[in-house]
């Protein structure tokens, strides 16, 4: 009888990857990042265990959106009070906090469970080309 090997949290080895977001399309880049954070590219992948790697994204301010999404795509938040809804266009969000645009796109592509919070903590996004993770020697990932 053959059995499937289930990954254990202690056995998982985590690598660091560096992604340059310069002139990359947001959605296509976010799907690749989400798959790496989940560990779907690894042979030891188990849905109930966080087997993913760390991802460092640089140049978030140079991300591209296709079509007219810079003006049309809206992000909403609500305070919980009546009339407390706020909206911001994707173009304004890139100007204010470009890191949030990538983080929100990747978060929407992760599973909606407790593991998603742990997976999202492994995503490090920086607006410019500099990042403080040189000591981890991240491998450059072409998307």
UniProtKB/Swiss-Prot annotation:
One of its GO terms (cellular component) is cytosolic large ribosomal subunit. Pfam families: Ribosomal_L13 (PF00572). The keyword Ribosomal protein applies. GO terms for molecular function: mRNA binding; structural constituent of ribosome. One of its GO terms (biological process) is negative regulation of translation. SUPFAM superfamilies: Ribosomal protein L13 (SSF52161). InterPro entries: Ribosomal_uL13 (IPR005822), Ribosomal_uL13_bac-type (IPR005823), Ribosomal_uL13_sf (IPR036899). Keywords: Ribonucleoprotein, Ribosomal protein. Part of the 50S ribosomal subunit. This protein is one of the early assembly proteins of the 50S ribosomal subunit, although it is not seen to bind rRNA by itself. It is important during the early stages of 50S assembly. Belongs to the universal ribosomal protein uL13 family. This is Large ribosomal subunit protein uL13.
């Amino acid at each position: 009888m053959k059995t499937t090997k289930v990954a254990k949290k202690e056995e998982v080895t985590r690598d660091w990857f560096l992604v340059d977001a310069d002139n990359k399309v947001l959605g296509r880049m976010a799907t690749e990042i989400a798959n790496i954070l989940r560990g779907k590219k690894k042979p030891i992948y188990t849905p109930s265990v966080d087997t993913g790697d760390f991802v460092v994204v640089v140049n978030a301010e140079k991300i591209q959106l296709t079509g007219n999404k810079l003006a049309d795509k809206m992000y909403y938040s609500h305070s919980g009070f009546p009339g407390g809804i706020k909206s911001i266009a994707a173009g304004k969000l890139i100007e204010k906090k470009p890191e949030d645009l990538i983080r929100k796109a990747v978060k929407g592509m992760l599973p909606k469970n407790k593991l998603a919070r742990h997976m999202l903590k492994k995503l490090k996004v920086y607006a410019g080309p500099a990042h403080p993770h040189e000591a981890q020697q991240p491998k450059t990932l072409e998307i």
